[in-house]
C-alpha cells in the first residue's frame, strides 16, 4: 500500500512538473447524429480528455468537478497527529522494564534445579518456578508520588508471566523440559 501511495505521489509530482506551463484546451464536442466515424473519433479522444481532466484536477483541485462530488481523503498529517496523541500515554520505559523482568525470570530459572539433577517431570519444574516466583513477590510500596502504579504494573506483568509459564507446563503434558529451551 505504501508503494502504491508512493507511485501516486510520484505521478502527481511528475504531472505537475510537465504541465506547469501548459494551457488547457477545450474538449471538442460534436452535435448531431452519432455515426461510426464520429464514434471512432470520440474513442480516440478519450485518453486526451482523461489527461485534460487529470491536469485540471491537479492544477485546480478546489474548483474541479471531481473534487466537488467525491469526499476528500484524510490527510496523512492528521493520521500522524492522532497516532502521536495515542502514543503520548504509553510509558517509554516499557520495553526496558520488560527486558529487565525477562532477565530476572531467566536468573530465577537458572537457580532452579535442572531436570537431570532433580529427576522430576516438567510439571513439577513449572510448579517450582511458579512457587519460587510467588515467594519472591512483594507487595508494591505505596508512595504519595504516584510510583505505586508503575510498581503495580511490574508486578502485574510478572503475575501474567507466571500464568503463562503455568499454562505452558500444563499444555506440555508429559513432555520433558530440556536445557536447550532456556
From Swiss-Prot:
Name of protein: Sperm acrosome-associated protein 7
Primary gene name: Spaca7
KW Thylakoid (keyword) present: no
Tissue: Testis-specific. Expressed in zygotene and pachytene spermatocytes, round spermatids, elongating spermatids and spermatozoa (at protein level). Testis-specific.
Known role: Involved in fertilization. Seems not to play a direct role in sperm-egg binding or gamete fusion.
Protein's cellular compartments: Secreted; Cytoplasmic vesicle, Secretory vesicle, Acrosome lumen
Single GO biological process annotation from the record: negative regulation of cell adhesion
Keyword Secreted among UniProt keywords: yes
Cellular component aspect of the GO annotation: acrosomal lumen; acrosomal vesicle; extracellular region
Amino acid at each position: 500500500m505504501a508503494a502504491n501511495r508512493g507511485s501516486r505521489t510520484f505521478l502527481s509530482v511528475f504531472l505537475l512538473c510537465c504541465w506547469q506551463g501548459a494551457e488547457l484546451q477545450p474538449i471538442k464536442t460534436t452535435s448531431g447524429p452519432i455515426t461510426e466515424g464520429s464514434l471512432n473519433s470520440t474513442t480516440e479522444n478519450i485518453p486526451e480528455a482523461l489527461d485534460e481532466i487529470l491536469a485540471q484536477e491537479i492544477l485546480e483541485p478546489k474548483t474541479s468537478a471531481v473534487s466537488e462530488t467525491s469526499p476528500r481523503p484524510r490527510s496523512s498529517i492528521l493520521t500522524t497527529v492522532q497516532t502521536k496523541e495515542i502514543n503520548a500515554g504509553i510509558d517509554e520505559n516499557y520495553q526496558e522494564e520488560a527486558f529487565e523482568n525477562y532477565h530476572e525470570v531467566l536468573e530465577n530459572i537458572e537457580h532452579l534445579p535442572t531436570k537431570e539433577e532433580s529427576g522430576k517431570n516438567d510439571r513439577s519444574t513449572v510448579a517450582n518456578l511458579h512457587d519460587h516466583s510467588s515467594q519472591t513477590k512483594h507487595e508494591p510500596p505505596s508512595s504519595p508520588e504516584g510510583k505505586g502504579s508503575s510498581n503495580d504494573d511490574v508486578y502485574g506483568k510478572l503475575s501474567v508471566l507466571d500464568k503463562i509459564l503455568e499454562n505452558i507446563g500444563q499444555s506440555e503434558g508429559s513432555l520433558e523440559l530440556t536445557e536447550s529451551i532456556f
